[in-house]
Amino acid sequence: MRTSRFLFATLRETPNDAEVISHQLMLRAGMIRKLASGLYTWLPMGTRVLKKVDAIVREEMNRSGAMEVFMPVTQPASLWEESGRYEQYGPGLLRFKDRHDNPFVLGPTHEEVITDLARNELKSYKQLPVNFYQIQTKFRDEIRPRFGVMRSREFIMKDAYSFHATQESLQETYNVMYDTYSRIFTRLGLDFRPVQADTGSIGGSASHEFHVLAASGEDDIAFSTESDYAANVEMAEAVLVGERAAPTQEFKLVETPNQKTIADVCQFLNADPKQSVKALLVQGVADEKGNVPVVALFLRGDHELNEIKAEKHPLVAAPLAFATEEQLQAFGLTAGFTGPQGLVEKGITVIVDRAASVLSDFVAGANEADKHAVGVNWERDAQITEVFDLRNVVEGDPSPDGKGTLQIKCGIEVGHIFQLGTKYSEALGCKVLGEDGKPFTVTMGCYGIGVTRVVAAAIEQNYDDKGIIWPQAIAPFEIAIVPMNAHKSPRTLEAAEALYAELQAQGFDVLLDDRNERPGVKFSDLELMGIPHRIVIGEKGLDAGTFEYKGRRDAEASNLTKEELLAKLAR
């Protein structure tokens, strides 16, 4: 491709509404332009990257044995009503009616559509297992689209759905897809981690997310320093460490006027937050009569509650909700000053996090306004109903697999795989005949990759102060050739044309910068766009039989003979 025939839409200034680096650089490099909130047009430069990601994903999905289909983004609302998600999904689901007053939705995902296809096309266990995939547009009506294509309303996704006769068959395909995703992200040149994850609104029994490590990531992931263990912080188990020591202090109450937070209390008492507990009073599961009990959750003062873990406790209502003022008053409790003493005796379930359960001589609320208790000890001063993992892990915690300690880094979720079980097949009546001639409900898995998000995530992981640094596999062009003074030097242009043709014949994506621009402008544009290899051809180099070569990550350029250059470029 020649720059004289290509849309160069680079910007010198960063648009004010671009928050994260990928959004800034995609705009400046001429990859995308905003059409409306959360909607973007992909320009030729961006489309080239998008198509390369698309090709790698498609190649690996085909290699896995999955079959490509293409489903409508517009879906009948009746399918979503059948699955029970029409109301459950919330305002992110864009609903509308056609001219005949038939209700439809714009698909944020395709579980309903693919299950409808399967129930009509799959008749026998002999047709199983099957795995269908598509690369298709999705629409989610985000309340606040932000970060460019990282969280847009319209986006491209690769979604796959598998159907099975048994859980064992699902597990086999799940493992294949896990390996397939690992190959995809490796080929894309990304530093990523597969992590155990919560199934969220999709549902199901098992789930892994694939995260690209980047400082701008919205998710915290924990992984071992000495093993392959990795999990979303929401899912990472906080291992019990140590044993409770015998009491050495007497229990007593102290005045703590207007000191409501743990930080304030510990500073006021000159105490270590690690030697304190904090209470979170939440609503429990209602009984047969509709009465909602209060459940007291206690954590160490320096730890944070993991709401997903708390919601998994059978006595805690989901979604998590704090106890009302009326409920607190009924037990004589004051928010900000609640301690564990006497709660079990009042009929309140006391669930204590593992780390808090091994404390002795700790600080806690006194169950009186403007007072706290010091020298508190479990069993002697306060009873525990149950010890349960309630907290987020922190850096340095032991890895749950017993190997090393945990590191925590930010990640951008670019892929997610689920074992759905029969959630959708049961709801939509997707059954096939078994070996015994009787119908049974099929078991499902689903597997997604955010194709447009991958592009942004790659930039978040690969950039410097000059612009993007693309992994070669997805760079819009692999090589840029810059002939110096081409409009005045036929010899330079001729050499550039010859090298351009030779490299193209070898299968490289090559950009010949034949613009009548100053060299500095050309170099700046090429660095901004992140092209991995730059070759400059000038009169002096031709006299010496060399080409000036600079890799995008190189600090300095070097002069290479043609043989050295071709060896450097060899894949």
Curated annotation (Swiss-Prot):
Consists of three domains: the N-terminal catalytic domain, the editing domain and the C-terminal anticodon-binding domain. InterPro entries: aa-tRNA-synt_IIb, aa-tRNA-synth_II, aa-tRNA-synth_II/BPL/LPL, Anticodon-bd, Anticodon-bd_dom_sf, Pro-tRNA-ligase_IIa, Pro-tRNA-synth_IIa_bac-type, Pro-tRNA-Synthase_IIa_type1. It holds the Pfam family tRNA-synt_2b. One of its GO terms (cellular component) is cytosol. This is Proline--tRNA ligase. Its main location: cytoplasm. It comes from Acinetobacter baumannii (strain SDF). GO terms for molecular function: aminoacyl-tRNA deacylase activity; ATP binding; proline-tRNA ligase activity. It catalyses: tRNA(Pro) + L-proline + ATP = L-prolyl-tRNA(Pro) + AMP + diphosphate. Keywords: Aminoacyl-tRNA synthetase, ATP-binding, Cytoplasm, Ligase, Nucleotide-binding, Protein biosynthesis. Homodimer. GO terms for biological process: prolyl-tRNA aminoacylation. It is found in: Cytoplasm.
